[in-house]
């Protein structure tokens, strides 16, 4: 298995947002993918396996699997269209967040991205302890939480 480190959102080395990318013939055990992410110590390590005409894509942080990661999706599309299937103009990814597509436009990649509805969630003791104040409301998506305490708002990303 080859592993790439790609800096998303830039055309300069050591800039942008780095992600590790592993395009594989078959899945590794979840624990192995988690250990690779821990060893990489980047915000995300992406793992992709081609299944039919699309790639199944999963993202792991050093702390666990996440449901969505934009920069690692772009990084994976870059690796696929540059090294794995250079003739491909559109890459489809099946993910925990649904189908994502990335279109290759000359030297650029254009990605669709899902929008998420905010869901109200109960205020927990963990939230109060983390913020040092009791939020008056709490809402979340699959990737983020939004907490309000009076006129102050908090955004927390997974």
Regions found by a protein language model. Give the residues of each.
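Active-site proximal loop and beta-alpha junction motif in alpha/beta enzyme cores
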Residues: 1-68, 74-158
């Amino acid at each position: 298995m080859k592993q790439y480190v790609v800096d998303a959102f830039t055309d300069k080395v050591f800039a942008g947002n780095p992600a590790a990318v592993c395009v594989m013939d078959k899945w590794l055990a979840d624990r192995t993918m988690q250990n690779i992410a821990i060893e990489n110590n980047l915000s995300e390590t992406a793992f992709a396996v081609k299944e039919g005409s699309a790639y199944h894509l999963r993202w792991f942080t050093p702390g666990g699997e996440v449901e969505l990661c934009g920069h690692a999706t772009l990084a994976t599309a870059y690796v696929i269209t540059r090294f794995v299937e250079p003739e491909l103009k559109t890459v489809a990814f099946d993910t925990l967040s649904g189908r994502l597509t990335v279109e290759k436009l000359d030297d650029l990649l254009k990605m669709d991205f899902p929008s998420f509805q905010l869901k109200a969630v109960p205020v927990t003791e963990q939230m109060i302890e983390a913020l040092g104040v009791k939020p008056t409301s709490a809402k979340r998506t699959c990737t983020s939480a939004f907490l309000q305490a009076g006129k102050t708002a908090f955004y927390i990303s997974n």
